[in-house]
Design a protein with these regions (language model features):
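Single conserved hydrophobic/aromatic residue that forms the stacking wall/gate
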Residues: 1-10, 14
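Glycine-rich anion/phosphate-binding loop at the beta-strand->alpha-helix junction
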Residues: 20-21, 27, 207-286
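Glycine-rich, mobile lid/loop segments that gate access to catalytic sites or pores
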Residues: 119-229
Length: 286
């Protein structure tokens, strides 16, 4: 019964720590995951299926750089199971073209970390953004794949999708997660995806880009994970998401819309359902 899960299982959800490393045009990028419990079934294919979803060059709307992004597990796994020791994984860069970036060595790109890297370190790797490249997320995805394995054992499921791109919102009446695999924008609404495709084609011609919103939903999560103040679960989630390059906002539940609400309508009341304490609403996002 996940609702009577013991303290060790609760802590197992949050004790993993990871550190990413590598640069966009270096030999490779990777991650070290520390704190993973022993005995979890894990192989490279468990990681690869998630990396295949994020690898570049899969549509005309992403970077034209093409990489296989094949992962190798270097440590922490023996005979198909985690050993409880740090898990190290690496993806080697294969098609980096550093000469393409020689022109920007002497100036700063807007919306990038070029200027701040120079200010902080007095030196920067200008090739593809170096450490600040979007390829840094390779390590996050690999670590997340391990987290998925752990969470699945506890009956916890995580899904994410694009809910808004270029000012175009999905219609929740047309919501179908299977549609995410049928369009280049990971949108669960085929009509919205078609509108975004038309909009994106226009931005391609203008040599411009566009922003969007990603929603993430977690089901099966037990109560009581996290700490009361500085290690609040929502605080740690916000820090994790805001550390991703280009992310400029984070909401849980109704988020900023709660500012226009009242306590009587925003606060989630409790009730009893099937012998369990549950909330009548979910404005707080769990």
């Amino acid at each position: 019964d996940l609702h009577r899960v013991d303290r060790r299982q609760r802590q197992m959800c949050i004790r993993d720590r990871f550190m990413t490393w590598g640069e966009s045009h270096g030999e490779g990028l990777g991650v070290v995951v520390d704190g993973c419990p022993a005995g979890i079934s894990l192989c490279e294919e468990d990681i690869q299926k998630f990396l295949n979803r994020r690898k570049p060059g899969q549509s005309k709307y992403t970077t034209p750089r093409k990489e296989d992004d094949r992962v190798s597990i270097l440590s922490g796994v023996f005979e198909g199971k985690t050993t409880g020791t740090p898990i190290s994984m690496v993806v080697y860069n294969k098609t980096q073209r550093s000469a393409d970036y020689s022109e920007i060595a002497g100036y700063y790109r807007p919306g990038h970390a070029d200027y701040t890297f120079d200010e902080k370190y007095g030196f920067r790797d200008y090739r593809g953004g170096g450490r600040s490249s979007g390829r840094e997320t390779i390590g996050r995805v690999a670590a997340g794949a391990i987290a998925v394995k752990i969470l699945e054992e506890l009956g916890i499921n995580v899904c994410a999708y694009s809910s808004r791109i270029g000012g175009i919102n999905i219609d929740y009446n047309n919501f179908d997660l299977k549609e995410c695999d049928n369009n280049a924008f990971n949108m669960p609404d085929s009509n919205a995806a078609m509108q975004v495709e038309k909009y994106a084609d226009g931005k391609l011609k203008e040599q411009d880009s566009m922003g969007g919103i990603i929603e993430c939903v977690v089901t099966g999560m037990m109560a009581g994970v996290g700490d009361p103040v500085f290690e609040k679960l929502d605080a740690n989630l916000a820090k994790a998401i805001m550390s991703i390059g280009a992310v400029k906002g984070f909401e849980i539940g109704d988020g900023f819309a709660a500012a226009d609400s009242t306590g009587s309508t925003n606060n989630d009341s409790f009730t009893i359902k099937d012998g369990r304490i549950v909330k009548k609403t979910n404005h707080s996002g769990g």
